[in-house]
Structure formats: structure tokens, C-alpha cells
Amino acid sequence: RSSDLENIRLYSVGSHAANAMHSVRPEFNIRPLIYGLPDYAAEKFSHYDLSYAGGRPLFATVGSFENRKGQDIFCKAIRLLPPETMKKASFLFVGKAAEAEMMDAVRSLTADCPDNVFYVKRLTRDEIKSLMAQCTCLVCASRDDPMPTFVTEGLIFGKPAIVSEHTGTAGLITEGVDGFVYEDDDPEKLAERLAWAIEHPEKLAAMRPACRELYESHYSKQAFSDSLQQAVKE
């Protein structure tokens, strides 16, 4: 009954989580309350040597290897790239192997493309920050991800991301301004975004101020504080 909900306030970490709840309880009024991350770019951290990536534009993804995270979709998209385009970039997968199918897809790709596809099981917090500072673009191919933290960490350093529509981040991105969204968990659509990004690194670099602004307006500790105070007032 609607009267039962009068004193209940519901909040979600973004539109993706809200949509999931609305699929079963469409009458709920759900407000956004997104986490806040520290400004890692203002901190000092040790340098992570990425020379193995060959100095090419680096596209990275971070997260445990499981079906939900969609590493297999990213692998398929890389394989769909025109050979000449693929050779212009490097790709890094970071994460522990939670599911064999995802790990097999990555290992097969690194075996077939050892010069520009790389796998690292674990990075320290400092190494993650250094990766974000140095990479060109993040890729989140998740089939279901309320608000991927590593994409937000990239925004702190002004780095754009290519994300699945099934992420919370997708609801905040302005296409081509501070990121890119692809649809339907479709490797071909992801490959199209990847190919454009690889061929236009200067345009990705020009997106940095907008990416940083996205962090400051939605994901900073100040933004979280403001949202939380507003929630308490409501």
C-alpha cells in the first residue's frame, strides 16, 4: 500500500540499480545516492612501470573475472578490431580468476596477441592509481554493474571510459563528451567504440576536463556529502 511507504525513503547508487528495483516495484520513488571517492590524483603514489605495454594507447579493465563483469565480451571486441587498428593499441586485464570461462577467454587472447594484450592478477592500490594516471581509456564490459569503482577512479584522473549500458555509470555519461556507452552487450558495438578511440587518441585526451568534472560533480567526497545532507533533510 502507498500509505506504508510514506515514511520510507529509498536511495540507490545510480539509475541501473534503481531500474532493477523498479522492474519489481515500479511504484517506489528511488533517489540517487552515489558513493564518494577521495581525490587520488592529489595524492603521492609510487610509479607503476607500464613499459611492457609498448608506449601505445592503453585500454584497461579492472575487476574479478566473472560472467557479470563481461571480460569475454571485451575479448571478443578486441578480436573484432581491424588488424591495423589493433596493432596501434595495448590492452590490459587486471583481476583474479573467479570463473574459468572468463579467464580462459583472456588467456587465449594473450596467447594469440602477446605483443599488445596483457594480464595482471593483482595490483596494489598505488599501482592502480598509477595505472589510472597513465592509461588512455578504461573499458567496462559488465553485463550488470551498479557503479563500477575502477571507472570512477579513472574519472579522477580525467580518463574517459567505454561502458556497457548495463552499468550505473552509463546513466551519467554524456556520449562523446565524458565517455562512451555501447548497447546490448554486443562485442561488435564495443569494437566500434574501441576502434574510434584507438584512431583518435587526441580526442580522448581532450575529454579530460569533462571527465574530471563528472567526477567532481557526482563522485567526489564533497558531492557525496552534499547528497547525503540533502537526503537527511528530506
Task: Identify the residue ranges that each predicted region occupies.
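Short hydrophobic beta-strand element within catalytic cores of glycosyltransferases
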Residues: 160-163
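Conserved acidic donor-binding segment of nucleotide-sugar-dependent glycosyltransferases
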Residues: 175-176, 180-187, 196-201
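Short alpha-helical donor nucleotide-sugar binding micro-motif in glycosyltransferases
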Residues: 122-123, 130-135
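Conserved donor-binding/catalytic core segment of Leloir-type glycosyltransferases
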Residues: 51-69, 75-78, 92
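A short, well-ordered alpha-helix in the C-terminal region of glycosyltransferases
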Residues: 189, 196, 203-218, 224
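Short, structured helix-loop element that forms part of the nucleotide-activated donor/catalytic region
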Residues: 17-22, 90-115, 127
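Aromatic "clamp/platform" in nucleotide-sugar-dependent glycosyltransferases that forms part
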Residues: 143
